[in-house]
Amino acid sequence: MPKKNKNLCVDDLRHAEYYSMQETFDKLYQKSKNGEVFKNLMDLILSQNNILLAYRNIKANGGSYTAGTDKKNITDIGSKSPDEVVEKVRFIVTGSKHGYRPKSVRRKDIPKPNGKTRPLGIPCIWDRLIQQCIKQILEPICEAKFSNNSYGFRPNRSVEHAMNRTYTMLQRMNLHYVIEFDIKGFFDNVNHSKLIKQMWSLGIQDKRLIFVIKRILKATIKMPDGSLIEPHKGTPQGGIISPLLANIVLNELDWWVASQWEENPIAVSRGRYRIIGKTEVFDKSHGYSLMKNTNLKEMHIIRYADDFRIFCRTKEEAVKTKEAVTKWIEERLKLEVSPEKTRIVNTRKRWSEFLGFKIRVRSKSHKYVVQSAICDKKVEIETDKLVEQAKNIAKPRKTKNCLLEIQLFNSMVLGIQNYYQLATCISIDCRNIHRRIMTVLTNRLNTEKVCMLKRDGGTVTETEKERFGNSKMI
């Protein structure tokens, strides 16, 4: 397996240290961990260093060049001096007698593989900058309160960590019944009042900040036909702060599921510290043993944004857990669980799908081991994308030449391998994809008279050499 860069969020850390904000973030995290409340966060949010750090961070994102309803992007902010940027942000948030009023959010429908569309809300660039300022201050406060079972849109956490935890549940803990939950239109149906209460309970009690966040949630949406809609629920997908708000909403679910078993008072009260190697860990195994003699249902959650799975030991426990969690989500979070897409999977007999992977367990030497592969739908989608790009190699588009098309094709292949390399059957999946791609390339290159490929030095990147150096195709 190729070496992977484990230095997650290095740029964010370097930028924060450059603007002398990392120490502030660390203090916020520790205060939140100690249970303190925060009633004066706006001064930090509108501090010069935090605003300049926010600009630095969103500038590094390619999406910052996408214009909102005011037709402006990051280059319009970049044309101003640092002092002018700081002054403008402060004026937008606090300068008006009516308070902060974000401009309309541009609605754009993004096609999905199933033929449907995903509504994307693109705020104006100044509003995105303000959201980034807020996110930077709220994130360390929320991180101190978030559950370890949540992996999506969080610093130093990724799909890789979520899948490793999934493998642990199935192979080491033998929790083979998986409940696949689906919340109907989660981002479009977040209850605003519930969200504000959850923020308050996390210690975010600055009324000026709460006012600003309410205005962000209530920002009008400009539809493609030019009409304006005032939202009464939901957070716009595409907003910088939306993933953090989504995690705040579902954090309550994480802790509720954990309280049923993993963090149950019986397990915690019977736990004790042990030294394993050179590390001191809190061992709750004695409490878990006692809980198995009760009517409590063992359940463990793994969540990535609004996509989550709950693992159970038996089918009976899974059925009761599915009913209890569905009822809790609908009553407490005011969200609707899709009965058609929510199901219980016995991974000893069928595949369970999660984050683009399909997973099951198989018997081997009197135990069960994990077997994983790319989801069938994802294989089809990725193959179709590569086939289209292979056709572009044979007949380059007007704005590109053959070499650029090859480089784009290689980057797509690397992207697939980097994401799915955790699958145990990745080589089989890639072999099947490769077979179809080579058929297309062979046919196209033999028939397209205008296409002649030559081996030119210097067209292979260091990453490609490291990954495919021994391949005959290099």
Regions picked out by a protein language model, each given a short descriptive name:
Residues K218, S227, L333-N401, E405-Q407, ...:
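A conserved non-catalytic segment of reverse transcriptases
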Residues R270-R274, K341-R350, F409-M412, C430-I437, ...:
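A glycine-rich phosphate-binding loop feature that marks nucleotide/adenosyl-phosphate handling sites
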Residues L46-L53, S104-R106, L217-K222, M299, ...:
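Core structural elements
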Residues I426-I474:
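A terminal-accessory region detector
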Residues M1-K33, I266-K284, L290:
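Intrinsically disordered, low-complexity and often Lys/Arg-enriched segments
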Residues H232-T235, A390-E405, Q417-I428:
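Short, solvent-exposed helix-loop connector elements
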Residues S104, N148-N149, R154, H161, ...:
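Conserved polymerase palm-domain catalytic core
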Residues N7, D12, A16-I240:
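Conserved pre-catalytic core of RNA-dependent polymerases
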